[in-house]
Amino acid sequence: MNVKGKVILSMLVVSTVIIVFWEFINSTEGSFLWIYHSKNPEVDDSSAQKGWWFLSWFNNGIHNYQQGEEDIDKEKGREETKGRKMTQQSFGYGTGLIQT
């Protein structure tokens, strides 16, 4: 292989490594490249699965990251609400206070 071929091949390898590393750094919740966490509407609300946005991109030509982030925010809100309810229930009974 001549020098020009080696230079082009090495630039291709280096740029691929940089892109993969950049995607890994900027991924959300451990998602990597085109694997994106999405909810499966057919299953219970508490379960999440990895969805392939790559396939849906071919169906409609777009990938809406904002919708995925909104789903994550909604799930966090449900967890916080559930946590508050459990805390209120645990402090509501057996506190040792005399109520008249």
UniProtKB/Swiss-Prot annotation:
One of its GO terms (cellular component) is Golgi cisterna. Keywords: Golgi apparatus, Membrane, Signal-anchor, Transmembrane, Transmembrane helix. It is a single-pass type II membrane protein. Residues 28-100 are lumenal. It is found in: Golgi apparatus, Golgi stack membrane. The chain crosses the membrane at residues 7-27. GO terms for biological process: leukotriene D4 biosynthetic process. Coiled coil: none annotated. This is Inactive N-acetyllactosaminide alpha-1,3-galactosyltransferase. It comes from Homo sapiens (Human).
